[in-house]
Curated annotation (Swiss-Prot):
Source taxonomy: Eukaryota, Rhodophyta, Florideophyceae, Rhodymeniophycidae, Gigartinales
Binding site for Mg(2+): E71
Self-association and partners: Dimer of alpha and beta chains. A typical microtubule is a hollow water-filled tube with an outer diameter of 25 nm and an inner diameter of 15 nM. Alpha-beta heterodimers associate head-to-tail to form protofilaments running lengthwise along the microtubule wall with the beta-tubulin subunit facing the microtubule plus end conferring a structural polarity. Microtubules usually have 13 protofilaments but different protofilament numbers can be found in some organisms and specialized cells.
Name of the protein in question: Tubulin beta-1 chain
Biased composition (Acidic residues): 436-453
Gene behind the chain: TUBB
Length: 453
């Protein structure tokens, strides 16, 4: 039984990142722009194709995806692009007026009007799955649609499918790649929702993406397209274990069981290797130790954090290409032994490894990384401080109140974010004796029927 994932792309950023993701994984599965299979290794490429694609009666493979936005521009551009034929034409839903970078418009007014249409698409996709394992959402938290309507959809889906997994790829705003002054509001209100309604949040920081492009890839003025390509490469690496046969973390629930020690602490930093400027890429010998070193290097992480300022609760690493499983495991043991101060001692064996024979497009070997580190509190503190300095003066609040929002919701979001920061601090400093309830919490695997492939 194939256990499928339904994807939602919400807002401009979510749809542009989503399109890059589908381009990347279609190439890996041998699917052309019209959804036809043109690969040469069907036993590998098609074995679990049903996770992300639905096979139509004409034999083409259609992404299980809903494309959603509050204005038509980006979706029309996708529909008319060369990949436009890949998607189901009925799975595009858009409003006309946009959210104007206002979370309340996305969550309470404009977005609420479109949400029923969106849920119809999602139900229709869910019904075509043999077994639905869960949902993945790509969106940004800085604007109005991805943040406001994105989190509205997450909460509606949670109500309707309470026992399915909910994972989000959430792009956090940055002053270097900034669109709008109210980003701290939109971001904090969104995180407030994601703490309660998501199982796994891959936090991708525009600031870190910008720094990777500028410092490592030597791109003087990174475009959104280049930032999105970075996100799509890490999404492809993280999802390879879901899409190809015989892997650790072969579904979203197992991924969460391995990475989430306490239900609220489900915000992950992600990374990808190799990263090198195109003119120097040919000069490096890629080996497992080299990739491992790059993955754990703060300059390669897609979150603007310094892992040395916190401790890893858990981590998962995925190697792709012709690499030996034993070498990967030995390297990770060595990495953990050498850096034991940066891993909590009360979760033994907290780095999970996985090897996938099928390389990423254009790479001989590559790797992806997911880290649940307490250092991510720095990101939340950054938004919390920006939020506080505006909220104290009630700056721009009238834009939100005029859509029917209450100040109380702002205060609740602020205190939920502050609680999250202090929980990360508490577990970062805890010793083996000081942690209670670790065994009891986390995810019960109460869906044994899901484990059947």
């Amino acid at each position: 039984m194939t256990r499928s994932i339904v994807s939602l792309q919400v807002g401009q950023c979510g749809n542009q990142v989503g399109l890059k993701f589908w381009e990347g994984i279609s190439a890996e599965h041998g699917i052309d722009v019209d959804g036809k299979y043109i690969g040469d290794r069907p036993d590998q490429e098609l074995h679990r194709i049903g996770v992300y694609y639905n096979e139509s009666s004409s034999g083409s493979y259609v992404p299980r995806a809903a494309m959603l936005d509050l204005e038509p521009g980006v979706l029309m551009a996708i529909k008319n692009s060369k990949r436009g034929q890949l998607f189901h034409p009925d799975n595009f839903a858009y409003g006309q007026s946009g959210a104007g970078n206002n979370w309340a418009k996305g969550h309470y007014t404009e977005g609420a009007e479109l949400v029923e249409t969106a849920l119809d698409i999602i139900r229709r996709e869910a019904e075509t799955c043999d077994v639905l394992q869960g949902f993945q959402v790509t969106h940004s938290l800085g604007g109005g649609t991805g943040s406001g309507m994105g989190t509205l959809l997450v909460s509606k889906i949670r109500e309707e499918y309470p026992d399915r997994m909910m994972c989000t790829y959430s792009v956090l705003p940055s002053p270097k790649v900034s669109d709008t002054v109210v980003e701290p509001y939109n971001c904090t209100l969104s995180i407030h929702q994601l703490i309660e309604n998501a199982d796994c949040v891959f936090a991708i920081d525009n600031e870190a993406l910008y720094n990777i492009c500028y410092n490592t890839l030597k791109i003087e003025q990174p475009s959104y397209d280049e930032l999105n390509s970075l996100i799509s490469s890490v999404m492809s690496g993280i999802t390879c274990s879901l899409r190809f046969p015989g892997q650790l973390n072969a579904d979203l629930r197992k991924l969460a069981v391995n990475l989430v020690p306490f239900p609220r602490l489900h915000f992950f930093a992600v990374g990808h290797a190799p990263l090198a400027a195109s003119n120097s890429a040919g000069y490096r010998s890629l080996s497992v130790p080299e990739l491992a070193g790059q993955m754990f290097d703060r300059n390669n992480m897609m979150a603007e954090i310094d892992p040395r300022e916190g401790r890893y609760l858990t981590a998962a690493v995925y190697f792709r290409g012709k690499v030996s499983t034993k070498e990967v495991e030995d390297e990770m043991t060595l990495m953990q032994t050498k850096n034991s101060a940066y891993f909590v001692e009360w979760i033994p064996h907290n780095i999970k490894t996985s090897v996938c024979d099928i390389p990423a497009a254009g790479e001989k070997i590559s790797s992806a990384f997911i880290g649940n580190t307490t250092a991510i509190e720095a990101t939340f503190k950054r938004f919390g401080n920006q939020f506080r300095s505006m909220f104290r003066r009630k700056a721009f609040l009238h834009w939100y109140k005029s859509e029917g929002m209450d100040e109380l919701e702002f205060s609740e979001a602020e205190s939920n974010l502050a609680d999250l920061v202090s929980e990360y601090q508490q577990y970062g400093e805890a010793t083996a004796d000081g942690v209670e309830g670790y065994e009891e919490e986390g995810y019960e695997n109460d869906h044994p029927e899901d484990d059947e492939e």
